[in-house]
Amino acid sequence: MIFIWFWRECDCLFGANNVIFIGRGHLSSKLVEEGALKMMEVSYIPCLAYPGGELKHGPIALIEEGTPVIAIAPSDSKLNLMESSIRECKARGAKIILITDHEGPITRFADVVIQTMKTHSELSPFVNIIPLQLL
């Protein structure tokens, strides 16, 4: 049942020319690299993984109307900075798939919110990798 929900909600991934993954902080940055690699291996869609802070240094130019952006935003000290990165992507017409354990204002910028359970920030990659694998 959860697979059907993922496929229906994340339909912007079908036919995408590229997919951009963003995360802030050491753990989230490494996690988006793994997610991008898995998606490229399975779907043969070009995927790019970037730390959210480096978005303005090139990757933002690749975002056009309908480009899927998968963002990981755990509840940690980087959450407000991640919200800023998501807002920039949304302003350029990206379809935002947000993976977060936060229920606050950051979710209003997402087209799809995949809610994960709250956990210690150092353990969040173990929880957040599951939705990335299901995508």
What are these model-derived regions, one by one?
Residues 1-134:
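A SIS-like phosphosugar-recognition module
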